[in-house]
Amino acid sequence: MALPRPVQYGKVQRMSYGKVKEVLDLPYLLEIQKKSFQWFLDEGLREVLREISPIKDYSETLLLEFVDYYFDGPPKYSEQECKERDATYARPLKVKVRLINKETGEIKEQDIYMGEFPIMTETGTFIINGAERVIVSQLIRSPGCYFASSIDKQGRKIFSGTLIPNRGAWLEFETDASELLSVRLDRTRKVSLTTLLKAFGLYNQQLIFEKFGEDERLKASLEKEANKGELGNPVENALLEVYRRLRPGEPPNVENARNLLYSMFFDPRRYDLAKVGRYKFNKKLSLWKRIFNKRAAQDVVDPKTGEILVKEGELITREIATQIQDAGVNEVWVYADEERPFKVVGNNTVKLDRYVEFDVSDINIKELVYRPVLDDILNTTNDVLEIKRLIKERERELVPYCLTIDDIFAATSYFLGLKYGIGTTDDIDHLGNRRVRAVGELLQNQFRIGLARMERVIRERMNIHDIDTVTPQTLINIRPVTAAIKEFFGSSPLSQFMDQVNPLAALTNKRRLSALGPGGLSRDRAGFEVRDVHHSHYGRMCPIETPEGPNIGLITSLATYARVNEYGFLETPYRKVDKKEARVTNEVVYLTADEEDTYKIAQATEPVDEEGRFINQRVTVRFGEEIIEVDKHEVDLIDISPKQIVSVSTSLIPFLENDDANRALMGSNMQRQAVPLLMTESPIIGTGVEYRAAVDSGVCILAKKDGVVENVSADEIVIRNNDGTKDVYHLLKFKRTNQGTCFNQRPIVRKGQEVKAGEVIADGPSTDHGELALGKNVLVAFMPWEGYNYEDAILISERLVKEDVYTSIHIEEYECEARDTKLGPEEITRDIPNVGEDAIKDLDERGIIRIGAEVKSGDILVGKVTPKGETELTAEERLLRAIFGEKARETRDTSLRVPHGEGGIVVDVKVFSRDKGDELPPGVNQLVRVYVAQKRKISVGDKMAGRHGNKGVISRILPVEDMPFLPDGTPVDIVLNPLGVPSRMNIGQILETHLGYAAKALGWKVATPVFDGAKEEDIEEALKLAGLNPTGKTILYDGRTGEPFDNEVTVGYMYMLKLVHLVDDKIHARSTGPYSLVTQQPLGGKAQFGGQRFGEMEVWALEAYGAAYTLQELLTVKSDDVTGRVKTYEAIVKGENIPEPGIPESFKVLVKELQSLCLDVKLLSEDNKEIELKESVDEDEQPQGLGAFEIGGDEIEEDKEDDKEKFYEDLMNATQEDDQGEIDDIDE
């Protein structure tokens, strides 16, 4: 066996087991975001402004044109400042506007400020109101022309078709049970197909048959209409009929009907196919695709030269078919299956370069062009320059983005031909029919909505304003535009709060594809077909990485090599194969899903010799959705790399090929939840993608140019470049991420070191020398240990705690704002009423905690007082106050305290105040932010996982001396349950363990790429080389007794991650706390500081044991017996017996609900006396009882803990004074 070869990944050398020669490096992983936003800035904005201008008033005297746009100056704040100040990272957008007065010929030009436009950061994110957000790309149905077939009750095939625009009305073709053809316009009522054709000018049977050939279905439809016996002009009758269907209840007239049809399908403002729609229409409806491989039923003659292109009865090859189309022939008779001729009608589009003499590459028209317009241009002039100018001028007519009459005829012809096997039906889940809308396009659509709203305002203003004094500035109101953009970034479901747990999570978030969102699918309506893995996903979308749960299959990830083309379709690269020699070339082609279906494609791992010739005579290839074996000379293409089918997350799993897909899915998802650790360590067993994933995620700092390090400190690196310039790189230290993990960068270069451009000079979170390092390499043993690893639990050694192996830093942010209230402004101060000196010892003179202080739950972070409502003053008091000045006003303590269960070290304090000129929300005078950091060691209850979906919860931390140890005395770090492997079928973890053991002994770092990694024999070889047992098993000794265990145990190094599901964030306890307003039961959940729900089934359990008193107090004094719980609290404080429970509040609510249904419900005692149901205490004074149990209620109460202490006293006094033990309504 050959040894692995050393490969350099950045600064790290790994021994790679990969055998496939990679011609193409991984592309830049954030390209989809960056490229799309750049397109928007360069082209997208211009397109929208061009679409909307000119805006005319109703009399067409004023014209408003948007000429140009530019970004004026840099962003106001840097990215870091924006995060601190809750600002948006944006640049001012200016648009050059021209106002033309047609009557006087006067032209006014102005540069108009169109608001602050959010700008993408270097790492593909946006900062909106201080929060880092990502715009997820959307996967939607592409506009185009789709046909489908279904089987009806009689077992006949029924065809249907739909013309779907980017925006505008749908046109649907349908066949009903009696084979009558009908059309649905914009999802309204059906119209007969022939009626629509008449409305479009084919007004009698002869014209229709001339156009489409004779067809029984058309005949039947025409006969049915003839029986109606309408008089008058057939075109007008048809128009009126269509209008009646579309606008039932309105009086029809021919003019309105004509306008309606025009505006529905032929008005560029109302109907838009977009570039991609036109491309798909031409692809589907052009002639050649339907006639090739058919026999001609008549001679086909070139209309220009008169030569016969194909004779009757001849087979039309691909070449002849394209020749026919380019010659401008739009109608061809071919033989359908049963020797019957059928007329195929195209949509009258041709290739531009066949008709003009010059090179068309410089006019930027790649699509087929509409023939009638082209003929019109060519007939006006012969001058080449003039033709060029006309083509540029009439580009929107040559390549129309709305329907043409020929499109509708071609679609009708296609629809008719399906019955005879001419044309194909479409699979809507095929990636050739789904496209990606990335940031740029989503923003463009939003901008378009804003401009359309603005246009309405401008039109109205044009009519109101005086024509002579009007300027562009007075006409334009930018509010609709800025509002549309703000709304998109703030509340669109596709604008997501960035997942920043670790660099991989951030990278994946930016490479997401979501089928949800506006214009997409909804979770409830999406069936299995949409969610399924499709053969066209190969190399474009990852079949593994998708969430578990309701979104499975709707949210996916971009494959490693995939890219989005100009139409929004996903493309993946292949290497070309020289068919004659059966030799793989280095030429790379990118193909979309529908182009790929016609080729035979071999696997990247197919063995080839030095020259690249296939070794095997028969080669396994993919062909459409089939996998077949063909002769080596038939292969067209070969995959570029084995990892091209999976996403970045998945390509980080070594031995992926040995894992079950379901577990690999969990592995991919859990890597994104790994917490950045204090000390990072890259995996011994990697896949070679770690370096690129870390560098492209943008958390590392790369040198911009070659040079020498001049100075290094913890937070900046100075490099003197070889070209004489100097670069200073600032590092981020201990910043809080969106998820509360810690973002910290540290330099990895020394003073005087030479660096190359693009070299990693500083590591970020979860990276180690420029490689992704999400977890730690630990020594694991697979064996049961006293039942502590039952059901996936994990037993760990105390060494991992002591040596901070799995310690992570978490930073929480607390904020406190001083506002203006009705009674006066709140004040941030050290002088807090009723608080001892001990509580404020760590506050500075302003009343803000000092940096470095250690705080526990309940400690004051920011002292704040709020003015209290004053009582009416007596005359004497008023007099005294007038003489001696203002007496200290009553204030109450509303300080910011550390929440229950939190705490740590204060690492940073930021103070913003209106006086210093900081921008604050209205009504806020001061804002203080306190950052508290915690060092969290690994503890019982934390969740850990490997990279293969092997997850578990820590059940016990054993002293090192009790852990099982190896013959040389090394104790293992983790003991895992061997029963977690066989049924889960993730054998990758075992291979990783074995190879890790060998690699650690040899001092290697290994790269074993997915689907091209180390085989079993390679691992055996490495174990032998390291002088270890080739089975990978070892005798282990019990740490408690020193005896060897009965059997040999699998031991080795595995890469284990600590996940973000930490026990500290989940554990929760409550004695008293907030109550729901209506039912008076405790709230639920940690966030509300709620109680434990004692539900229906738990009640049954206690009933089954007859535990009546336990049950009684659970349902009353521990929950919603308002008076009882106060008395109980009092009794416990005084050490008395607990009193009798009263009536639960929820019973009173039930009685009230019954009374509201007009049922007279009374509560009677044993001797038929009515029991008064006292109303519960006034809303403002919420009594706080014991209540730690919630029996139902889920309403959340607003904080009403104004003056708890005083209220307790009042309540207690009232209770003692009252003999009956009932509390009367207390009014303070």
Curated annotation (Swiss-Prot):
Enzyme class: transferase
Highest taxon of the lineage: Bacteria
Keyword tags: DNA-directed RNA polymerase, Nucleotidyltransferase, Transcription, Transferase
Substrates-to-products reaction catalysed: RNA(n) + a ribonucleoside 5'-triphosphate = RNA(n+1) + diphosphate
A Pfam family it matches: RNA_pol_Rpb2_6
InterPro entries: DNA-dir_RNA_pol_bsu_ext_1_sf, DNA-dir_RNA_pol_bsu_external_1, DNA-dir_RNA_pol_su2, DNA-dir_RNAP_su2_dom, DNA-dir_RNAP_su2_hyb_sf, RNA_pol_bsu_bac, RNA_pol_bsu_CS, RNA_pol_bsu_protrusion
EC numbers for this chain: 2.7.7.6
Protein name per Swiss-Prot or TrEMBL: DNA-directed RNA polymerase subunit beta
Organism: Caldicellulosiruptor bescii (strain ATCC BAA-1888 / DSM 6725 / KCTC 15123 / Z-1320) (Anaerocellum thermophilum)
